[in-house]
């Protein structure tokens, strides 16, 4: 796994052994950040259900001011910390251990990226409900194309859906 563009372009980052996480594919990550390009510089970013931290690290590489990595899996937390240390970017990042639904509202940001494990469909709705109460400028949800997400949740309205293979990105603002 590698960083696609920006300050840390082509730098390798560790992944988590086994099937406990499903990293965002490089092509989908590139598409995401091509869309975010005008908004990422100087933004604050939350990578919720962070896994390896690849999405939040990509945000930092492309100019985000600060990123929060929300994750509960201990092995994933260790990998995120190792990846941040290898890039010497710890001062611009905060790793938050614990269930995302308990930590999400304590870390407001300009851009929030949600990528819950695909089988946890209720987690998507619950996270969007939380964000809908105190909406960020932009929320992006990575999900399986077969999952139907709401058009609106609280103050958030879906503005765009991008599909690639079995993956989709739903944008809310």
Regions inferred by a protein language model and the residue ranges of each:
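Class I S-adenosyl-L-methionine-dependent methyltransferase catalytic core
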Residues: 1-173
């Amino acid at each position: 796994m590698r960083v696609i563009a920006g300050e840390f372009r082509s730098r390798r980052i560790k992944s988590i052994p086994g099937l406990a996480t499903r990293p965002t594919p490089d092509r989908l990550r590139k598409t995401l950040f091509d869309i975010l390009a005008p908004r990422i510089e100087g933004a604050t970013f939350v990578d919720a259900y962070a896994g390896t931290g690849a999405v939040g690290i990509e945000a930092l590489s492309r100019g985000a001011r600060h990123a929060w990595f929300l994750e509960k899996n201990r092995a994933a937390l260790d990998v995120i910390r190792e990846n941040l240390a290898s890039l010497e970017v710890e001062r611009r990042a905060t790793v938050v251990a614990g269930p995302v639904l308990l930590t999400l509202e304590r870390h407001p940001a300009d851009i929030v990226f949600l990528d819950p494990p695909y089988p946890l469909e209720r987690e998507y709705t619950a996270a969007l409900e939380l964000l809908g109460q105190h909406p960020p400028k932009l929320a992006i949800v990575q999900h399986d194309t077969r999952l139907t997400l709401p058009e609106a949740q609280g103050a958030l309205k879906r503005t765009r859906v991008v599909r690639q293979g079995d993956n989709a990105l739903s944008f809310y603002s």
